[in-house]
Each structure stands twice: as C-alpha cells, then as structure tokens.
C-alpha cells in the first residue's frame, strides 16, 4: 500500500463512508470531490474511478478499497470507500483503514437497512468514535413527514448502539443531484448540501490525538547484549515518545511486569536524547539481563497498558479463496494468536448457541491465551495456523 506524501499544513483526519449497499456511498464520495474541486481543494473522482477500487492485501486478506483525498478550509482528509459489504467488514476489523470518524450514508427513500445496522455495530465494536449522517436520495422524498420519520429511525438506531443519536448531525441531500448540477456553489440547492455535510464533518469529528501525544509503547522485536553496556531491546516506537533517563515497564509473557530505566536510545547507529512514534530504535535498559526480556513483550510508559490473557474480539475468518481454512472450526479451537511481534497459543469460545464458524464469516468470540500479552481495546491481531493467517481480529473488551 503506497502512502503518498502530502503537504501537512492542516490537521489530518481519516474518514470513510459506511452504510447499506446501493444507498449511495460512492456517489456521495464522488460528489464531495466534485464540489471541493470547484474551490481547488480536491481533484474530482468520478463514480467509476472510485468504484473500480484496487485490491490491497492487509495481513494476507484481500480488500478492495478506494482512497480519495481532499481538503476543507480547516483540514486535510483521507477518505476510504469500499465497493463491497465484505470489504467494509474486513477493513474495519483489520484496521487497514483506521477511521477517526465516518459518514453514515442512509437512503432517505428506504431508511435504515440490515447493513446500516451492521456497519453501526462494527463502528461501535472496532472503535470508530464519531459518526455524521448523510440522508442521501432526498430528491426522491416529497413528504417532509417521511423525512422526519427516517431521521428519527436513524437516531434511534444509533442510540441503540451507544452512539449519541440525539446529538449526531444529520444532513439531507442528494449526491446524484449534486453530481448532475456540478456548480459547486454553497447557495446551490444540491451542491450546498454537500457543503453543509462537510461543515458538519469539520465541526463534529474532532482532530485525533497524534500518535506522539499518546503514552509511550514499543513492541520488542529483538534483544541483544552489548558487552560492558548491558541489554538492548530494538523495535519501532508505536506511539508516544521516550527520553533517555525515563522509566518504562516490560509488559507481557512474564509472571509479573518489571520496571527499568532507558539509559540510552540509538537510531541508525547514532545516539539520541529521545525517540518518537515511527522511529526504529534500540533502547539500552538498566539492570535488565538478556533472559529478562524477549520478542513479543512491549516497553511501555508505566501503568499505561496491562498484561491480560482473556478478552472478547470481533474476528473475520478468511475464506478458502483468500488462503484461509477449507473447513469450519468449532468451540475450543486452538490456533496461534499473533500480537504485534509474536505468536501465542490460545483457545476460542464461540458465542452461546453458535456451534461452528465457517471460512468467510465475521463473528464475536472470547479468546483465552496461554500466556499474558499487553492488550487493550482496539488492538489488532492475526489468527494463524502453522504459520499461515486464517483470521484477523480486533480486541473489543478485556475480561482478565
């Protein structure tokens, strides 16, 4: 997945369109790029260009995703749109496209449908924190009372999944009419509605906390000893910053969490005073012996993450075509769970009344690991069998 560099003069936010098939997610995405292109803040992407999304592979799973980017006066946006329903599920579970917020597209003519519900549930489960609603196809509804009913229904549905349904902004319009008009003016009946939508997205979806502002965490990839100096753990800083002299905890795979002090930070063979999210570093750890630390543990800001063995997760099971299992698995299935840098054996408990899980399914399950791992809600993992990926999951709740 090539990530293009862009000029970072404005805060950056990742969003996406979600909602039921044929309610107009891609048309809406195209309309946003058209309207913003009129003021030089986007390049117009036609429906067909977005719909013919390239295949990407994320953790061995094939996902079709279209990426468009555009700006408003206040922000730079990266926007994902998926052609197929299954692509959304895979995207949200693998975190291939992390969303800081989503535009939920609901056809005003049809109201909420099964996939509307499923996408809201997934957004809740995988931690998409904010939703703005676009009631599309408003040109097909003449009765204002009907519009009000659909709006009420959407608000109730959002509230039932613990989103603040009463406060969520809802904008009604028509992506198709905005595309047909194409003037891009704020005072236009249809293009103006796209502006109203983007104004709400700007206002309602907060700028995410930057990775560097979060508590320090570095998954340990490798460990070695430097004679006369001590033990060095290497890895890529996932979030936060670390300064020489700061205290960290070594979390996971051990009976207890131990504290140590980082006495040196090195990157590209140069000594640094500090490192931040994204840096590949070596950390020299005071008083830690080679046997006290291993790949699969994390170095973290004390108290910021705990070791756990049991949790709930939302999981996508790879289909046979994706190189997954050819047969279903049952309660008590014991694969490997790959967290950050290592595999840990564990077993799966399926929900009550569910006998088995078929390749291609997505399912909520409880997982118990044989060893502790530094786990928190929102952490992504892979399920593997003999070294090949058979599933992808995200932690939705900690049990113990």
From Swiss-Prot:
Keywords attached to this entry: Cytoplasm, Elongation factor, GTP-binding, Hydrolase, Magnesium, Metal-binding, Nucleotide-binding, Protein biosynthesis
Residues that hold GTP according to the record: 19-26, 81-85, 136-139
Region of interest (G4), ranges: 136-139
Enzyme Commission number(s) from the entry: 3.6.5.3
Domain of life: Bacteria
Chief location: cytoplasm
Region (G1): 19-26
Entry GO CC: cytosol
PROSITE patterns documented for this protein: G_TR_1, G_TR_2
Domain tr-type G: 10-209
Region (G5), start-end ranges: 174-176
Molecular function per GO: GTP binding; GTPase activity; translation elongation factor activity
Region (G2): 60-64
Top-level enzyme category: hydrolase
Binding residue positions for Mg(2+): 26
Catalyses which reaction(s): GTP + H2O = GDP + phosphate + H(+)
Subcellular localization: Cytoplasm
Region G3, annotated ranges: 81-84
InterPro entries, sorted: EF-Tu_GTP-bd (IPR041709), EF-Tu_GTPase (IPR050055), EFTu-like_2 (IPR004161), EFTU_2 (IPR033720), G_TR_CS (IPR031157), P-loop_NTPase (IPR027417), Small_GTP-bd (IPR005225), T_Tr_GTP-bd_dom (IPR000795)
Quaternary context: Monomer.
Protein purpose: GTP hydrolase that promotes the GTP-dependent binding of aminoacyl-tRNA to the A-site of ribosomes during protein biosynthesis.
UniProt similarity note: Belongs to the TRAFAC class translation factor GTPase superfamily. Classic translation factor GTPase family. EF-Tu/EF-1A subfamily.
UniProt protein name: Elongation factor Tu
Native species: Heliobacterium modesticaldum (strain ATCC 51547 / Ice1)
């Amino acid at each position: 997945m090539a990530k293009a560099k862009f000029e970072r003069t404005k805060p950056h936010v990742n969003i996406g369109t979600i909602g039921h098939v044929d309610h107009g997610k891609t048309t809406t995405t195209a309309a946003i790029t058209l309207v913003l292109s009129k003021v030089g803040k986007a390049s117009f992407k036609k429906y067909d260009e977005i719909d013919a999304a390239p295949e990407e592979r994320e953790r061995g799973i094939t996902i079709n995703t279209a990426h468009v980017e555009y700006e408003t006066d206040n922000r730079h946006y990266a926007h994902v749109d998926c052609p197929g329903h299954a692509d959304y599920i895979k995207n949200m579970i693998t975190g291939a496209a992390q969303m800081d917020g989503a535009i939920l597209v609901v056809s005003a003519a049809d109201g909420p449908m099964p996939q509307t519900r499923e996408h809201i549930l997934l957004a809740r489960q995988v931690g998409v924190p904010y939703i703005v609603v676009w009631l599309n196809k408003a040109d097909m509804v003449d009765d204002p009372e009907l519009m009000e009913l659909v709006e009420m229904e959407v608000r109730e549905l959002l509230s039932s999944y613990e989103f603040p349904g009463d406060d969520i902004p809802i904008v009604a319009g028509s992506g198709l009419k905005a595309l047909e008009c194409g003037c891009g003016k704020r005072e236009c009946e249809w293009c103006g509605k796209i502006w109203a939508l983007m104004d709400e997205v700007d206002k309602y979806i907060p700028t995410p906390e930057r990775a560097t502002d979060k508590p320090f965490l570095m998954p340990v990839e490798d460990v070695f000893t430097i004679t006369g100096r001590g033990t060095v753990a290497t890895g890529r800083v996932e979030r936060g910053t670390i300064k020489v002299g700061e205290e960290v905890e070594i979390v996971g795979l051990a009976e207890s969490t131990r504290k140590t002090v980082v006495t040196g930070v090195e990157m590209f063979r140069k000594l640094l005073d500090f490192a931040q999210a994204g840096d590949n570093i070596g950390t020299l750890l005071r008083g830690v012996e080679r046997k006290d630390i291993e790949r699969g543990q994390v170095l973290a800001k004390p108290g910021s993450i705990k070791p756990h063995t049991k949790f709930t997760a939302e999981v996508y099971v790879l289909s046979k075509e994706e190189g997954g299992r050819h047969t279903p698995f049952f309660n008590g299935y014991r694969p490997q769970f790959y967290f950050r840098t290592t595999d840990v054996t564990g077993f799966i408990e399926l929900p009550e009344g569910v006998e088995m899980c078929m390749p291609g399914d997505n399912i909520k399950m409880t997982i118990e690991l044989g060893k502790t791992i530094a786990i928190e809600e929102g952490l992504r993992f892979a399920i593997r069998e003999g070294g090949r990926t058979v599933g992808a999951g995200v932690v939705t709740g900690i049990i113990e």
